[in-house]
C-alpha cells in the first residue's frame, strides 16, 4: 500500500514541521494542493521542507515549482487540466467516475479516484460509488495499482481496503 497525503487547501503555522515529520515516519508522497493561493507561499513552504523530501512532492498548482524545487511531478485537475508544453516527468490526475478512470489511467503514472467516501474537507461532496460498483471495477481490472482512493480515507477505511485488497 502506498501512503499519499494531500495537504489542506490553506497554509497553517508549522505546516513544514508536520510535513517533514510525516516523511520521517514513512509518508510515500505528498500532494501540495493549495488552490487560489499565491505561488510565493508554496515556494516558502518548500524552502522549509528538507530538500531530500522534494522528490516525493507533487504540486497541483504553479507547475514551475516542479523544476525549481526538483519535485516529483505535477497533478492535473479541473483547475489545471493540461500539462505544460514540453513537460516531461511524473503526472497524476483526478478522476470522478469509473468510466473516467478506465479512459484516463493509462496516460498517467497514477490517478486519484474520488470521492470514495463522503468528503471531510469539501462541503456537500459525497461519494457516488457503491461497494458493488467498486468490486466490479476491480474485477474488470479498472481499479488496479495505478488507482488511488481519495475522499475521507481514514484508518478504519484503510483497514477495510487492505482486507478487500482494492484501492
Predicted regions, residues:
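Glycine/Thr-rich beta-alpha phosphate-binding loop at enzyme active sites
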Residues: 69, 78, 90-139, 145
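Glycine-rich beta-strand-to-loop/alpha-helix junction loops that act as flexible
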Residues: 148-152
